[in-house]
Amino acid sequence: MLASQRDLFQMPRDTCYLNSASYSPLPLRTQEAGRAAVGRKATPWTLEPGFANHQHERARAAAARLIHADAADMALIPSISYGVATAAKILTIERGTRVIVLENDHSSPVLEWHTRAGAQGFAVETVNRPDDGDWTSAVLAAIERSGAAPVGLASISSVHWSDGGLIDIEKVGLALRQRGASFLIDATHSAGVLTMDVRRLDPDFVLFPTYKWLLGPYGRAFLYVARRHQGGIPLEQTAFGRRDVRAENEVYFADVSYLPDARRFDMGERDHFISMEMASIGMEMMAEWGASAVAQRLLMLTERIAEGLRGFGVSAPERSVRAPHILSLGFENLGFENLGFEDGMPAGLIEGLATEGIYVAPRLGRMRISPHVFNDEADADRFVAALAKRLRG
């Protein structure tokens, strides 16, 4: 099993950080690269002419490696919302069809379609959170529902951000392909941790940022665009998205036809000297460890926590329907009325744990625990002991 990588991070022993699904800490290597990059921007005359392009292509290749894509199929973007807006501009959603989204999915893969539905004549259908936590069956039932309008698109996360609910994207993708529907995957909480092979899966779009599981900075994200969509018009019109629009040319607009691959969809002002290399380092580290090894380690930690809390009245999704790296705890039936707890998470519980140097997140009335490779068994045991003590009063 992959060992704890704590020594690669600025992680004090008395800090128990279990909130990587919000923000992951930066590895020491990434911090060093960021400091060097600030110095580089301070002395721009030292930059080699090809430096920026090298940074772009290094990041593009690192992102592609995580999902088994070709680098030419990856666009550099600043956020998931930017990527979804790009996909929405490229796609034609037929009138009278449905766009499938998840209840309380993050805003990016949802709101774009609500905004466009009226003008474009399609309906947005929300798949409600299933009582048994089985998102895959619920999504498939919505796609396959007899008598419903055809599905034009499913725009969903592969792992639900709030509780780690896992969607089997291979099963969903197959059902969509059989109906000629498009598939957009927000892989924010799966890229680098869960194996994804776009060659086999054949989605239309896959998006992910670096600031959570990929150990990178905020503001760097990536968009996979299937080749069948690479003739689309980009969200922004840039010189570098065209074949030959260069300041060095005698004729500036020498060839304004678009690049033939996903590079045409790169964001404007992509020369982020400081954060682009930082993003590359985190993605490269994740790829070197391997998604299977990372998932195995994090499953060990979340299972250790779940097992340690048995008998304390908290609920957690069944292992079969949750991602290995996120554990969500519910407090609906604590049975501690004599302690003044009402149904739901006790008030001040998250804040109280933080006073002990233990960091988790409140999400939709539940507690979300999200360890990463810097965590170890001592962190898991410390969290269990602290939470158990507070629940006992």
Residues of each region from the PLM?
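Pyridoxal 5′-phosphate
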Residues: M1-G393
